[in-house]
UniProtKB/Swiss-Prot annotation:
Localization annotation: Secreted
Signal peptide: 1-25
Effect on the protein of changing residue 17 to A: In strain: ATCC 49503
PANTHER family: CYTOCHROME C OXIDASE ASSEMBLY FACTOR 7 (PTHR13891:SF1)
Entry keyword Hydrolase: yes
Membrane spanning stretches: none
Enzyme class: hydrolase
GO cellular component terms, A-Z: extracellular region
Variant or mutagenesis effect after changing residue 9 to F: In strain: ATCC 49503
Name the UniProt record assigns to this protein: Beta-lactamase HcpA
InterPro entries attached to this UniProt entry: HcpB-like (IPR040239), Sel1-like (IPR006597), TPR-like_helical_dom_sf (IPR011990), TPR_rpt (IPR019734)
TPR repeats: 29-62, 67-98, 100-133, 134-169, 170-202
UniProt gene name: hcpA
């Protein structure tokens, strides 16, 4: 009788396992990307590559971009810029802003492809449309200096503003700079303040200069010094020099 009980229990357990297997779904594309990131953190690049490949096959743009980065940097695979470009392109086509931005970098610098500032600007433009902050900032710089696209200060400012809104501190600083040279000091202060809040020492230094010189605000030497200190702690040489000139120790 005991033998029959054991057989019954075993049968139930087997049935439970079969049911469990049936309920356990394969990881979806997003989960595969997360698994890939975890494997990469553990320096298991071969396993990470496998996860990213599967995610990319499932049309996850971020997975394709990670795979491209592995080929660009030679992690878990031989370094291969052509393959990197192939996967960045697929990521960009799948509307991943990082992929578009990285493609822009490669075309701008002529890495793995012929140098082409115009094509780079097109990829940066798509990256920006997809709300990739760095893409907006770099595209703004291209318009600012007329590289690969007509020079357009108004367009540059709009792009810097968008980058700043997306919490890109260089975008805030560049927007602040344009406002400064056009004597719109109050707007410059707003942008430099945001850059400083984003822990960018250059923004803190620029804000301090405006506070010290009473540009767009009442003169405030005490607050200026505090911002020079923040800048100096972030290794901004000009901020450290300002403190030395004022004979103030960090």
């Amino acid at each position: 009788m005991l033998g029959n009980v054991k057989k019954t229990l075993f049968g139930v357990l087997c049935l439970g396992t079969l049911c469990l297997r049936g309920l356990m779904a394969e990881p979806d594309a997003k989960e595969l990307v997360n698994l890939g990131i975890e494997s990469a953190k553990k320096q298991d690049f071969a396993q990470a590559k496998t996860h990213f490949e599967k995610a990319c096959e499932l049309k996850n743009g971020f997975g394709c971009v990670f795979l491209g980065a592995f080929y660009e940097e030679g992690k878990g695979v031989g370094k291969d810029l052509k393959k990197a470009i192939q996967f960045y392109t697929k990521g960009c086509e799948l509307n991943d802003g990082y992929g578009c931005n990285l493609l822009g970098n490669l075309y701008y610098n002529g890495q793995g492809v012929s140098k082409d500032a115009k094509k780079a600007s097109q990829y940066y433009s798509k990256a920006c449309d997809l709300n990739h902050a760095e893409g907006c900032m770099v595209l703004g710089s291209l318009h600012h200096y007329g590289v690969g696209t007509p020079k357009d200060l108004r367009k540059a400012l709009d792009l810097y503003e968008k980058a700043c809104d997306l919490k890109d501190s260089p975008g805030c600083i560049n927007a602040g700079y344009i406002y400064s040279v056009t004597k719109n000091f109050k707007e410059a202060i707003v942008r430099y303040s945001k850059a400083c809040e984003l822990k960018d020492g250059r923004g803190c230094y620029n804000l301090g200069v405006m506070q010290y010189n009473a540009q767009g605000t009442a003169k405030d030497e005490k607050q200026a010094v505090e911002n020079f200190k923040k800048g100096c702690k972030s290794s901004v040489k000009e901020a450290c020099d300002a403190l030395k000139e004022l004979k103030i120790e960090l």
